[in-house]
Amino acid sequence: MSRIGKKPVVIPAGVTAKVEGQAISVKGGKGELHFTAPDYVSVALEGTQIAVSPRSEDKKARAAWGMTRSIVNNLVIGVSQGFERKLEITGVGYKAAVQGKNLQLSLGYSHDISFPIPDGIAIAAPKPTEVSITGIDKQRVGQIAAEIRALRPPEPYKGKGVKYAGEFIFRKEGKKK
């Protein structure tokens, strides 16, 4: 039995949810999100809660059960509170700035990188060494953060590069004479 899947998703005040077959749509103060649940699970709206249950006891249904519940929960949190991912830039001359619909990054290459900001995502650079990515879709916020980090991942000797806030970088010692 899935410990996560058996918990119903509570819908807070100010958020409306609609379930039509396998399609779930959630609307809140920050926007609207849609999700289509896999056929292995059934989704039901019970008052101010959304309950997810497996249609059978096979392995695929049990695997999709907890995942579907978590995705529905992330939809509800996204439209009510939103999601944020912070990145830190470390290195001499490494910096970021938002210019219009682009994030300009100087990451030690011979050229600056212009990263286009997609619709539905807000990117801010409160300091030249900090980038904040916010949005209502947890998957998209994490994906954009991963794409920016992949432009210059932190290296293990000096820690230069783009890393998630709070991420531990395994450090190595330089070669000895």
UniProtKB/Swiss-Prot annotation:
Keywords linked to the UniProt accession: Ribonucleoprotein, Ribosomal protein, RNA-binding, rRNA-binding
Name of a matching Pfam family: Ribosomal_L6
GO MF annotations in UniProt: rRNA binding; structural constituent of ribosome
Q: Which GO CC terms are listed, alphabetically?
A: cytosolic large ribosomal subunit
User: Is Ribosomal protein a UniProt keyword of this protein?
Assistant: yes
Q: Which GO terms describe its biological process?
A: cytoplasmic translation
Superkingdom is: Bacteria
- Annotated NCBIfam families: L6_bact (TIGR03654)
Its biological purpose is as follows:
This protein binds to the 23S rRNA, and is important in its secondary structure. It is located near the subunit interface in the base of the L7/L12 stalk, and near the tRNA binding site of the peptidyltransferase center.
HAMAP family found in the cross-reference section: Ribosomal_uL6_B (MF_01365_B)
Q: Subunit details for this protein?
A: Part of the 50S ribosomal subunit.
Q: What's this protein's family per the entry?
A: Belongs to the universal ribosomal protein uL6 family.
Q: Protein name, please?
A: Large ribosomal subunit protein uL6
This chain's source organism reads: Beijerinckia indica subsp. indica (strain ATCC 9039 / DSM 1715 / NCIMB 8712)
